């Protein structure tokens, strides 16, 4: 297998995860900003690798597998770190909801692909808006430069949580008849 630039970008995103975690725990005033910058950079590679793969016609099976895995791991790690930092149910609850949704939908997509109906659970616009709200909230909650950014990030986190439920129910609804078949 020959790796192309989009796949290298996806692999780079995976490699950034331990550095992102390390930056989170560094005992320096600038550590939250560095952590947020690494997260933003990783999130940007998520968009860029897909863009390049489509534009250069370099989509691969490995890239199609690795890209969503890298995304989910990056976001799940960020949500766990944020929940740990705030150590509060009102942050942990939406974080756990979002992680659970990712596991449920990933499993649903895999199952639908096995029965030949992968397109029934394609990514929706609600999922894309959820991702934008989620990324925005995580950047703010990782960085925490001031109280206003933190408050705006809390609001975005809850918007992302609501959209998480909405998109999850859309996916489940699209697959419902297949799920109920004997």
Swiss-Prot record:
Location within or outside the cell: Cell inner membrane
Key words, A-Z: Cell inner membrane, Cell membrane, Lipid biosynthesis, Lipid metabolism, Membrane, Phospholipid biosynthesis, Phospholipid metabolism, Transferase, Transmembrane, Transmembrane helix
First-level EC class: transferase
UniProt xrefs under PROSITE patterns: CDP_ALCOHOL_P_TRANSF (PS00379)
Periplasmic-side segments: 38-60, 108-145
Spans traversing the lipid bilayer: 13-37, 61-81, 87-107, 146-168
Enzymatic reactions: a CDP-1,2-diacyl-sn-glycerol + sn-glycerol 3-phosphate = a 1,2-diacyl-sn-glycero-3-phospho-(1'-sn-glycero-3'-phosphate) + CMP + H(+)
Mode of membrane association: Multi-pass membrane protein
Gene3D superfamilies reported in the protein's UniProt record: 1.20.120.1760
Record protein name field: CDP-diacylglycerol--glycerol-3-phosphate 3-phosphatidyltransferase
Biological source species: Yersinia pestis
């Amino acid at each position: 297998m020959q790796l192309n630039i989009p796949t290298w970008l996806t692999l780079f995103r995976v490699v950034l995860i331990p550095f992102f975690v390390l930056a989170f725990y560094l005992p320096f005033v600038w550590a939250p900003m560095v952590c947020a910058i690494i997260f933003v950079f990783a999130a940007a590679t998520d968009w860029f690798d897909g863009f390049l793969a489509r534009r250069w016609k370099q989509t691969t099976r490995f890239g199609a597998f690795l890209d969503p895995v890298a995304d989910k791991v990056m976001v799940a790690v960020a949500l766990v770190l944020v929940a740990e930092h705030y150590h509060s149910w009102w942050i942990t609850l939406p974080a756990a909801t979002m992680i659970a949704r990712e596991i449920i939908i990933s499993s649903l997509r895999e199952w639908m692909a096995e029965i030949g109906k992968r397109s029934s659970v394609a990514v929706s616009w609600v999922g894309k808006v959820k991702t934008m709200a989620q990324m925005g909230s995580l950047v703010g909650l990782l960085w925490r430069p001031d109280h206003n950014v933190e408050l705006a990030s809390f609001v975005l986190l809850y918007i992302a949580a609501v959209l998480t439920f909405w998109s999850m129910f859309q996916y489940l609804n699209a697959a419902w008849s297949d799920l109920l078949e004997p």
